[in-house]
Regions:
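Active-site beta->alpha loop and helix N-cap motifs at the rims of alpha/beta catalytic domains
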Residues: 2-145
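Short, flexible micro-motifs
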Residues: 46-47, 80, 165, 213, ...
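Catalytic alpha/beta core domains of metabolic enzymes, predominantly
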Residues: 124-128, 134-247
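C-terminal alpha-helical cap/extension of soluble enzyme domains
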Residues: 8-14, 30-36, 204-206, 211-281
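Alpha-helical scaffold segments in soluble metabolic enzymes
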Residues: 62, 120, 153, 221, ...
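A general structural signal for well-ordered alpha-helical segments in protein cores
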Residues: 24, 56, 60, 83, ...
Length: 281
C-alpha cells in the first residue's frame, strides 16, 4: 500500500556562482525536524540545466547524507547510456531508502522507446524507479501526455515504483490517475494541495510540496486534517499561491527560502533576481 505524504523538491544554493551544499545539508535537516518524510531532486526546482553532472551528484549526495527519510533523486534528461551511468554512480552514496527518478529527454515518437529508456535505467539501478511524466512535444507535431497504458506497462514489468504526475489538462488528469494501478506511488505536481485534493479520489496518494518547502508542518496538518480545516485554510493558501505565481514559482520559492535564511542565498546566471518590492510582497 502506497503511503499518503507530501514530497519536498530541493533547490540548489550557490556561492559566487559555485554550488554550495552546506546550506542544503542544513535545510534538509530542518525539513526532517519539521515533519517532512520525503524529499526529491527534479529537473526544474533543482535546476539541472544550470548544473553539471558532477554537481547534480554533489547535490544529491548532500541530501542523502543529511536527510533521515526517503530521498528520490532525479536523473538528468540525457541519453539512455548516460542515464544508466548516472544511476550506477549513485552507488557511492545511496542508502536503503534512496530511489531514483528517470526523465525521458526528447520528443515523443512511440511508447516503446520510452519503455526501453526507463527499463534500462531500472536495470542499471537494480530495481523499480520513479518516472517524471511531464507533457512533451511530439516529433510529428503537437504535444503528448503520458498515458495510463505506458505507465502501467512499466509497473507490470517491475520497472516502475511511482510517478511525478504532471498531466497538462487537469480534468484529463483525473482519468489518467484513475487508470493507473493502485500500487503505483502517484506524486501530484503543479497546484500542490489543491490539485491533490482533486486527484486523491482518483488514486493519487502524494503531492509535491508548495508552502511545505517553507513550513512543512502546515502540509502535515493538511494530510492529517478533516476537510473543514482545509476549507478554512484555502483562502490563505490561495493568496500565497497567487503571489508566488505573479513573480514565477521557482523564483519566488528561492527568494522566500533566502528571506527565511534556510537556503538559496545566491543564484547562478542566467537566473533573474527579484526586486526588493517583489521580495517584500
Amino acid at each position: 500500500m502506497v503511503d499518503k505524504k507530501f514530497v519536498v523538491a530541493i533547490p540548489p544554493s550557490y556561492f559566487v556562482e559555485s554550488l554550495e551544499t552546506e546550506s542544503t545539508s542544513e535545510y534538509v535537516k530542518y525539513l526532517h525536524d519539521n515533519s517532512a518524510t520525503t524529499v526529491m531532486t527534479t529537473a526544474g526546482t533543482s535546476q539541472f540545466n544550470l548544473l553539471s553532472t558532477k554537481e547534480i551528484h554533489q547535490l544529491n549526495q548532500s541530501i542523502v547524507d543529511n536527510f533521515d527519510g526517503v530521498s528520490i533523486l532525479g536523473v538528468p534528461g540525457c541519453s539512455t547510456k548516460d542515464a544508466c551511468n548516472f544511476v550506477e554512480d549513485t552507488e557511492q552514496y545511496r542508502k536503503h531508502n534512496t530511489h531514483v527518478m528517470a526523465l525521458y529527454p526528447d520528443r515523443f515518437y512511440d511508447k516503446n522507446t520510452i519503455i526501453e529508456h526507463v527499463s534500462r535505467i531500472s536495470d542499471a539501478w537494480g530495481g523499480p524507479v520513479y518516472l517524471h511524466t511531464p507533457k512533451m512535444r511530439k516529433g510529428t507535431g503537437g504535444d503528448w501526455d503520458y498515458t495510463a497504458e505506458v505507465v502501467n506497462e512499466l509497473y507490470h514489468t517491475d520497472k516502475l515504483a511511482g510517478i511525478k504526475e504532471e498531466h497538462s489538462d487537469l480534468s484529463a488528469s483525473y482519468n489518467f490517475v484513475a487508470g493507473l494501478n493502485k500500487h503505483i506511488d502517484v506524486i501530484v505536481a503543479g497546484g500542490s494541495m489543491r490539485r491533490f485534493n482533486y486527484l486523491e479520489s482518483a488514486g493519487a496518494n502524494a503531492f509535491l510540496s508548495g508552502i511545505g518547502n517553507l513550513f512543512p508542518e502546515i502540509e502535515t496538518k493538511f494530510l492529517n486534517s478533516h476537510h473543514d480545516w482545509y476549507e478554512s485554510f484555502l483562502q490563505q493558501e490561495t493568496k500565497f499561491f497567487n503571489t508566488f505565481l505573479k513573480y514565477g514559482w521557482h523564483a519566488s520559492l528561492r527568494s522566500a527560502l533566502k528571506l527565511l535564511e534556510l537556503t538559496c542565498f545566491n543564484n547562478r546566471s542566467p537566473w533573474p533576481e527579484l526586486s526588493a518590492d517583489a521580495e517584500f510582497e
